[in-house]
Amino acid sequence: MVQAIVRSSAHIGLSLHRNFHSMKRTILNLFVFVVCVLTGGMLNGIIVKYSSAIVPPPIGFDLTTEEGLKAAMTVMEPKHFIMPFLAHAIGTLAGAFLVTLFIKERKLFRALLVGFLFFLAGCYMVFVLPSPLWFDALDLGLAYIPMAWLGYKLAIRFSK
């Protein structure tokens, strides 16, 4: 009887240790995931912020505010949409690459989850900031999920 109680309590202790280890790994994975998404988002923001140095905005318009962007949208040419597209694509690619590199399990799922989160942010921007339909289709179709998949593939190749 005593031996059964000792074995049972040892089993419970081992079970608690495994659960703690699993919870610790889950929290660490969540932290790494959030940091990677934020890193991709910051890279996106940096590219957008400094894009006017590469492609000057239309004359007389301030693209640093939402109102300025809305006002300039009717006079913007396709060249003005290159940098926002690249910012979205590179930010997503970087976030998915980093997630794949640093998280040990379910890499593809997590990389695509990064792409999906960025895709949701892109959908939000489509509703908030009216832009040409061709840009919305290109951006939503190519800058998020495909770039997350590419980030995953590059990280797998890089880590070999």
What kind of feature is each model-predicted range?
Residues 7-22:
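Short, Lys/Arg-enriched N-terminal segments with co-localized hydrophobic residues
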Residues 21-160:
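Juxtamembrane/disordered regions of integral membrane proteins
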